[in-house]
Amino acid sequence: MSGLLRYLHCSPAWRVLRPAAPGMQGGRFRSNYAAEEGIEEEIQFAAARQEDPSSLYSDHIPTNAVQKLLLSAGSAVMALYDPYRHDMVAVLGETTGAVALRKLRDQMRRDPEGLQILQERPRIRMSTLDFQTLREMPDGTFGREYARFLDVNHVTPDTRMPVKFVDDEELAYVAQRYREVHDLMHTLLGMPTNMLGEVVVKWFEAVQTGLPMCILGAAFGPLRLNNKRMKKLGVLVPWAVQSGRNARCVLNFYYEKRWGQSVASLREEIGILPPPEIKA
Protein backbone atom coordinates (compact mmCIF):
# COMPACT_ATOMS: atom_id res chain seq x y z
CA MET A 1 0.00 0.00 0.00
CA SER A 2 2.81 2.44 0.86
CA GLY A 3 4.38 1.78 -2.53
CA LEU A 4 1.07 2.47 -4.26
CA LEU A 5 0.62 5.75 -2.40
CA ARG A 6 4.16 6.83 -3.33
CA TYR A 7 3.39 6.01 -6.96
CA LEU A 8 0.12 7.97 -6.90
CA HIS A 9 1.75 10.93 -5.18
CA CYS A 10 4.23 11.19 -8.05
CA SER A 11 1.59 10.80 -10.75
CA PRO A 12 -0.07 13.77 -12.48
CA ALA A 13 -3.49 12.69 -11.19
CA TRP A 14 -2.41 13.01 -7.55
CA ARG A 15 -1.58 16.71 -8.01
CA VAL A 16 -5.25 17.64 -7.81
CA LEU A 17 -5.50 16.45 -4.20
CA ARG A 18 -2.85 18.86 -2.96
CA PRO A 19 -4.10 21.72 -0.78
CA ALA A 20 -5.51 24.74 -2.55
CA ALA A 21 -3.17 27.63 -3.18
CA PRO A 22 -3.84 31.12 -1.83
CA GLY A 23 -5.25 32.01 -5.25
CA MET A 24 -8.68 30.63 -4.33
CA GLN A 25 -10.99 33.58 -3.76
CA GLY A 26 -14.64 34.46 -3.84
CA GLY A 27 -15.97 30.90 -3.81
CA ARG A 28 -14.35 29.90 -7.09
CA PHE A 29 -11.09 28.08 -7.70
CA ARG A 30 -8.69 30.62 -9.25
CA SER A 31 -5.40 28.81 -8.79
CA ASN A 32 -3.29 26.91 -11.32
CA TYR A 33 -0.16 24.79 -11.34
CA ALA A 34 2.01 27.73 -12.37
CA ALA A 35 0.99 29.64 -9.25
CA GLU A 36 1.48 26.63 -6.97
CA GLU A 37 4.50 24.87 -8.38
CA GLY A 38 6.30 27.40 -10.53
CA ILE A 39 6.13 28.14 -14.23
CA GLU A 40 8.95 25.80 -15.19
CA GLU A 41 7.35 22.74 -13.59
CA GLU A 42 4.00 23.57 -15.20
CA ILE A 43 5.60 23.73 -18.64
CA GLN A 44 7.34 20.40 -18.11
CA PHE A 45 4.13 18.77 -16.84
CA ALA A 46 2.08 20.10 -19.76
CA ALA A 47 4.67 18.88 -22.26
CA ALA A 48 4.74 15.42 -20.68
CA ARG A 49 0.96 15.24 -20.74
CA GLN A 50 0.78 16.19 -24.42
CA GLU A 51 3.34 13.54 -25.26
CA ASP A 52 1.36 10.79 -23.49
CA PRO A 53 0.03 8.59 -26.31
CA SER A 54 -2.91 7.50 -24.15
CA SER A 55 -4.25 11.07 -23.81
CA LEU A 56 -7.59 11.40 -25.60
CA TYR A 57 -7.88 15.22 -25.64
CA SER A 58 -5.77 18.24 -24.77
CA ASP A 59 -6.30 18.30 -20.99
CA HIS A 60 -6.78 14.55 -20.50
CA ILE A 61 -4.87 12.86 -17.68
CA PRO A 62 -5.15 9.06 -18.10
CA THR A 63 -5.80 7.16 -14.86
CA ASN A 64 -6.34 3.52 -13.99
CA ALA A 65 -9.13 2.11 -11.82
CA VAL A 66 -7.13 2.31 -8.58
CA GLN A 67 -6.15 5.91 -9.21
CA LYS A 68 -9.75 6.82 -9.98
CA LEU A 69 -10.92 5.17 -6.77
CA LEU A 70 -8.42 7.09 -4.65
CA LEU A 71 -9.13 10.33 -6.49
CA SER A 72 -12.85 9.83 -5.92
CA ALA A 73 -12.40 9.16 -2.21
CA GLY A 74 -9.93 11.98 -1.67
CA SER A 75 -11.90 14.57 -3.62
CA ALA A 76 -15.15 13.57 -1.87
CA VAL A 77 -13.60 14.10 1.57
CA MET A 78 -12.12 17.45 0.60
CA ALA A 79 -15.29 18.63 -1.14
CA LEU A 80 -17.35 17.80 1.96
CA TYR A 81 -14.84 19.54 4.21
CA ASP A 82 -14.80 22.66 2.02
CA PRO A 83 -17.63 22.92 -0.54
CA TYR A 84 -15.89 25.93 -2.10
CA ARG A 85 -13.07 23.67 -3.28
CA HIS A 86 -14.52 23.66 -6.78
CA ASP A 87 -11.42 21.87 -8.04
CA MET A 88 -12.27 18.93 -5.76
CA VAL A 89 -15.94 19.04 -6.75
CA ALA A 90 -14.83 18.92 -10.40
CA VAL A 91 -12.57 15.90 -9.84
CA LEU A 92 -15.33 14.07 -7.96
CA GLY A 93 -17.74 14.68 -10.81
CA GLU A 94 -15.31 13.35 -13.39
CA THR A 95 -14.21 10.23 -11.53
CA THR A 96 -17.68 9.09 -10.45
CA GLY A 97 -19.93 10.25 -13.28
CA ALA A 98 -19.30 7.84 -16.17
CA VAL A 99 -22.73 6.18 -16.10
CA ALA A 100 -24.62 9.46 -15.75
CA LEU A 101 -22.54 11.11 -18.48
CA ARG A 102 -23.34 8.30 -20.90
CA LYS A 103 -27.06 8.73 -20.21
CA LEU A 104 -26.79 12.49 -20.75
CA ARG A 105 -24.84 11.94 -23.98
CA ASP A 106 -27.54 9.54 -25.22
CA GLN A 107 -30.26 12.08 -24.42
CA MET A 108 -28.37 14.68 -26.42
CA ARG A 109 -27.95 12.32 -29.37
CA ARG A 110 -31.71 11.70 -29.48
CA ASP A 111 -32.58 15.41 -29.53
CA PRO A 112 -32.00 17.53 -32.69
CA GLU A 113 -30.69 20.54 -30.75
CA GLY A 114 -28.66 18.35 -28.41
CA LEU A 115 -27.14 16.50 -31.36
CA GLN A 116 -26.20 19.81 -32.97
CA ILE A 117 -24.42 20.81 -29.77
CA LEU A 118 -22.49 17.52 -29.72
CA GLN A 119 -21.46 18.04 -33.34
CA GLU A 120 -20.50 21.72 -33.10
CA ARG A 121 -19.00 21.65 -29.57
CA PRO A 122 -19.75 25.27 -28.55
CA ARG A 123 -17.93 26.63 -25.50
CA ILE A 124 -19.10 29.25 -23.02
CA ARG A 125 -15.96 31.29 -22.37
CA MET A 126 -14.97 34.94 -22.15
CA SER A 127 -13.31 34.49 -25.55
CA THR A 128 -16.48 33.17 -27.22
CA LEU A 129 -19.09 35.56 -25.80
CA ASP A 130 -19.62 39.28 -26.37
CA PHE A 131 -20.45 40.34 -22.84
CA GLN A 132 -20.83 44.00 -23.71
CA THR A 133 -23.61 43.08 -26.13
CA LEU A 134 -25.23 40.89 -23.47
CA ARG A 135 -25.12 43.76 -20.96
CA GLU A 136 -26.86 46.05 -23.45
CA MET A 137 -29.78 43.68 -24.06
CA PRO A 138 -33.20 44.58 -22.61
CA ASP A 139 -33.92 43.67 -19.01
CA GLY A 140 -35.57 40.28 -18.71
CA THR A 141 -33.80 38.75 -21.69
CA PHE A 142 -31.73 35.67 -21.00
CA GLY A 143 -28.52 37.32 -22.19
CA ARG A 144 -29.01 40.41 -20.02
CA GLU A 145 -29.88 38.44 -16.91
CA TYR A 146 -26.92 36.08 -17.41
CA ALA A 147 -24.54 39.05 -17.72
CA ARG A 148 -26.14 40.60 -14.64
CA PHE A 149 -25.67 37.34 -12.71
CA LEU A 150 -21.96 37.29 -13.56
CA ASP A 151 -21.48 40.96 -12.67
CA VAL A 152 -23.39 40.82 -9.38
CA ASN A 153 -21.60 37.66 -8.21
CA HIS A 154 -18.18 38.73 -9.54
CA VAL A 155 -17.60 35.54 -11.51
CA THR A 156 -16.75 34.67 -15.11
CA PRO A 157 -17.29 31.51 -17.17
CA ASP A 158 -13.52 31.08 -17.32
CA THR A 159 -13.43 30.03 -13.66
CA ARG A 160 -14.78 26.63 -14.71
CA MET A 161 -11.97 24.08 -14.77
CA PRO A 162 -11.27 21.96 -17.86
CA VAL A 163 -12.23 18.29 -17.72
CA LYS A 164 -9.22 16.03 -17.14
CA PHE A 165 -10.20 12.57 -15.88
CA VAL A 166 -13.01 11.44 -18.20
CA ASP A 167 -11.66 8.65 -20.41
CA ASP A 168 -13.83 9.33 -23.45
CA GLU A 169 -13.50 12.41 -25.63
CA GLU A 170 -17.22 12.86 -26.29
CA LEU A 171 -18.19 12.26 -22.66
CA ALA A 172 -15.51 14.75 -21.65
CA TYR A 173 -17.28 17.36 -23.76
CA VAL A 174 -20.63 16.47 -22.15
CA ALA A 175 -19.04 16.98 -18.73
CA GLN A 176 -17.52 20.27 -19.86
CA ARG A 177 -20.85 21.44 -21.29
CA TYR A 178 -22.62 20.62 -18.02
CA ARG A 179 -19.94 22.54 -16.14
CA GLU A 180 -20.22 25.58 -18.40
CA VAL A 181 -24.03 25.80 -18.31
CA HIS A 182 -24.04 25.64 -14.49
CA ASP A 183 -24.13 29.44 -14.20
CA LEU A 184 -26.93 29.51 -16.78
CA MET A 185 -28.91 27.28 -14.42
CA HIS A 186 -28.30 29.79 -11.64
CA THR A 187 -29.70 32.47 -13.94
CA LEU A 188 -32.77 30.49 -14.96
CA LEU A 189 -33.47 29.36 -11.40
CA GLY A 190 -32.83 32.84 -10.01
CA MET A 191 -30.30 31.54 -7.48
CA PRO A 192 -27.18 33.40 -6.22
CA THR A 193 -23.78 31.77 -5.68
CA ASN A 194 -24.02 31.61 -1.88
CA MET A 195 -24.35 28.24 -0.15
CA LEU A 196 -28.15 28.32 -0.20
CA GLY A 197 -28.22 29.07 -3.91
CA GLU A 198 -25.66 26.38 -4.70
CA VAL A 199 -27.59 23.74 -2.74
CA VAL A 200 -30.84 24.58 -4.54
CA VAL A 201 -29.14 24.40 -7.94
CA LYS A 202 -27.51 21.10 -6.94
CA TRP A 203 -30.93 19.61 -6.11
CA PHE A 204 -32.19 20.63 -9.54
CA GLU A 205 -29.06 19.26 -11.24
CA ALA A 206 -29.12 16.04 -9.21
CA VAL A 207 -32.61 15.25 -10.49
CA GLN A 208 -31.73 16.36 -14.02
CA THR A 209 -28.37 14.66 -14.47
CA GLY A 210 -28.06 11.86 -11.91
CA LEU A 211 -24.41 12.82 -11.41
CA PRO A 212 -23.16 11.45 -8.05
CA MET A 213 -21.36 14.73 -7.39
CA CYS A 214 -24.66 16.64 -7.64
CA ILE A 215 -26.43 14.14 -5.40
CA LEU A 216 -23.65 14.42 -2.81
CA GLY A 217 -23.79 18.23 -2.88
CA ALA A 218 -27.57 18.24 -2.59
CA ALA A 219 -27.51 15.82 0.35
CA PHE A 220 -24.67 17.29 2.40
CA GLY A 221 -24.73 20.96 1.39
CA PRO A 222 -27.60 21.80 3.79
CA LEU A 223 -25.41 20.84 6.76
CA ARG A 224 -23.65 24.19 6.37
CA LEU A 225 -26.81 26.30 6.40
CA ASN A 226 -28.11 28.20 9.43
CA ASN A 227 -31.69 27.87 10.68
CA LYS A 228 -32.98 30.85 8.70
CA ARG A 229 -31.64 29.50 5.44
CA MET A 230 -32.82 25.98 6.25
CA LYS A 231 -36.37 27.35 6.42
CA LYS A 232 -35.93 28.89 2.97
CA LEU A 233 -34.46 25.62 1.72
CA GLY A 234 -37.60 23.83 2.88
CA VAL A 235 -39.55 25.87 0.33
CA LEU A 236 -36.96 25.90 -2.44
CA VAL A 237 -35.98 22.21 -2.54
CA PRO A 238 -39.45 20.86 -3.42
CA TRP A 239 -39.65 23.46 -6.20
CA ALA A 240 -36.15 22.56 -7.47
CA VAL A 241 -36.93 18.83 -7.44
CA GLN A 242 -40.27 19.30 -9.18
CA SER A 243 -38.66 21.57 -11.76
CA GLY A 244 -35.87 19.05 -12.35
CA ARG A 245 -38.39 16.29 -12.97
CA ASN A 246 -40.61 18.45 -15.15
CA ALA A 247 -37.83 19.98 -17.27
CA ARG A 248 -36.41 18.62 -20.49
CA CYS A 249 -32.71 17.76 -20.46
CA VAL A 250 -31.01 21.11 -19.89
CA LEU A 251 -28.07 20.08 -22.07
CA ASN A 252 -30.35 19.96 -25.11
CA PHE A 253 -30.63 23.74 -25.39
CA TYR A 254 -28.26 25.81 -27.52
CA TYR A 255 -28.20 28.68 -25.04
CA GLU A 256 -25.80 30.75 -27.12
CA LYS A 257 -28.59 31.15 -29.69
CA ARG A 258 -31.18 32.17 -27.11
CA TRP A 259 -29.70 35.28 -25.53
CA GLY A 260 -32.52 37.43 -26.91
CA GLN A 261 -35.25 35.14 -25.55
CA SER A 262 -36.95 36.21 -22.34
CA VAL A 263 -36.04 34.30 -19.19
CA ALA A 264 -39.73 33.59 -18.57
CA SER A 265 -40.18 32.17 -22.07
CA LEU A 266 -37.04 30.01 -21.84
CA ARG A 267 -38.05 28.69 -18.42
CA GLU A 268 -41.42 27.70 -19.83
CA GLU A 269 -39.84 26.02 -22.86
CA ILE A 270 -37.42 24.03 -20.71
CA GLY A 271 -40.06 23.17 -18.14
CA ILE A 272 -38.65 25.08 -15.14
CA LEU A 273 -41.45 26.17 -12.84
CA PRO A 274 -41.60 29.83 -11.74
CA PRO A 275 -39.47 30.34 -8.60
CA PRO A 276 -41.46 30.61 -5.35
CA GLU A 277 -41.47 33.90 -3.50
CA ILE A 278 -39.37 33.75 -0.35
CA LYS A 279 -39.81 36.18 2.53
CA ALA A 280 -36.60 37.96 3.51
Swiss-Prot record:
Membrane-related topology note: Peripheral membrane protein
GO cellular component annotations of the record: extrinsic component of mitochondrial inner membrane
Enzyme class of the recorded protein, top EC level: lyase
EC number, UniProt record: 4.1.1.130
Pathway recorded for this protein: Cofactor biosynthesis; ubiquinone biosynthesis
Keyword Aminoacyl-tRNA synthetase tagged: no
Compartments (UniProt record): Mitochondrion inner membrane
An example Gene Ontology molecular-function term: 4-hydroxy-3-methoxy-5-polyprenylbenzoate decarboxylase activity
Known catalytic reactions: a 4-hydroxy-3-methoxy-5-(all-trans-polyprenyl)benzoate + H(+) = a 2-methoxy-6-(all-trans-polyprenyl)phenol + CO2
InterPro entries listed in its UniProt record: Coq4, Coq4_euk
Residues the record lists as binding Zn(2+): 182-183, 186, 198
Range of the transit peptide: 1-15
UniProt cofactor(s): Zn(2+)
Keyword Zinc among UniProt keywords: yes
Key words, A-Z: Lyase, Membrane, Metal-binding, Mitochondrion, Mitochondrion inner membrane, Transit peptide, Ubiquinone biosynthesis, Zinc
Subunit record text: Component of a multi-subunit COQ enzyme complex, composed of at least coq3, coq4, coq5, coq6, coq7 and coq9.
Free-text function comment from the UniProt entry: Lyase that catalyzes the C1-decarboxylation of 4-hydroxy-3-methoxy-5-(all-trans-polyprenyl)benzoic acid into 2-methoxy-6-(all-trans-polyprenyl)phenol during ubiquinone biosynthesis.
PANTHER family assigned: UBIQUINONE BIOSYNTHESIS PROTEIN, UBIQUINONE BIOSYNTHESIS PROTEIN COQ4 HOMOLOG, MITOCHONDRIAL
Family designation: Belongs to the COQ4 family.
Protein name: Ubiquinone biosynthesis protein COQ4 homolog, mitochondrial
Species the sequence originates in: Xenopus tropicalis
Lineage, uppermost ranks: Eukaryota, Metazoa, Chordata, Craniata, Vertebrata
Gene symbol of the encoding locus: coq4
